[in-house]
A protein has these predicted regions:
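Extracellular calcium-associated, cysteine-rich motifs in secreted modular proteins
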Residues: 1-227
Length: 227
């Protein structure tokens, strides 16, 4: 007993979407009935909002985003369906991304799709498509936002595009190039980060070799009268 009425009539339709379940063994006594795209049966027998899967990656051709309507209708695959489950953003290309969009190529298998001409890192694609431990770079400096244990190419300053490494872990960055901010004058000494008078001794009196006179003038420092 069944109630399918779209691909064939009167066959089992577990999710009630009108598309019959697969019957590869010909148990109906007629002939094998394969799932789309190899046949017309429901590729998602337990998901009523999906039934076709053109690229066979496990993500359906139907979509829920109305902005896709014109393009998808021109492609003649799938239909708009309110709250469609896991709509394939790349219906002609096999892919397994699940984070920023469903069903697109994901070279490093971290869940975030590889960027392409229509979907870049600024849209949500993987900013590091070959590094499975990184995917986002909100300050666009080439170092990743993920700071979890084991992550590579970690940005110690994810919101400062002029800094990325903090070797001594004091919250001040190693990069001292022109224009950089939050610069550590002592990148290897965690108890010092600023040297206001440029004499090589840190301003923090309680830190390593703290400067007793942190505001000495250039002339005083250069003359050696005071440090």
């Amino acid at each position: 007993r069944g109630y399918s009425n779209l691909d064939r009539f009167g066959c089992l339709d577990s999710d009630g979407d009108g598309w019959s379940d697969v019957d590869p063994g010909g148990l109906d006594g007629v002939e094998p009935w394969f799932a789309h795209p190899n046949g017309s049966a429901d590729a998602f027998p337990f998901t009523p909002s999906q039934w076709n899967d053109t690229d066979e990656d496990g993500f359906g051709d139907n979509w829920a985003d109305g902005s896709w309507n014109e393009t998808r209708m021109n492609w003649s695959i799938g239909v708009w369906y309110a709250n469609a489950s896991q709509p394939d953003a790349c219906p002609f290309v096999t892919g397994f991304s699940v984070e920023d969009r469903f069903g697109c190529p994901d070279a490093d298998n971290d869940g975030w799709s590889d960027p392409d001409s229509n979907w870049t890192a600024s849209n949500g694609a993987d900013a590091f498509p070959d590094n499975p431990t990184q995917w986002s770079d909100r300050d666009n400096d080439g170092w990743g936002d993920n700071q979890s244990e084991g992550a590579l190419q970690v940005d110690d300053f994810p919101d400062n595009p002029t800094q990325w490494l903090d070797t001594d872990g004091d919250g001040w960055g190693d990069n001292n190039s022109y224009g950089a901010t939050q610069v550590d004058d002592f990148p290897l000494i965690p108890s010092q980060y600023r040297d206001t008078d440029g004499d090589g001794y840190g301003d923090d009196i309680n830190g390593f070799e703290g400067d007793v006179c942190p505001l000495s003038t250039v002339e005083e420092v250069e003359s050696g009268w005071i440090s």
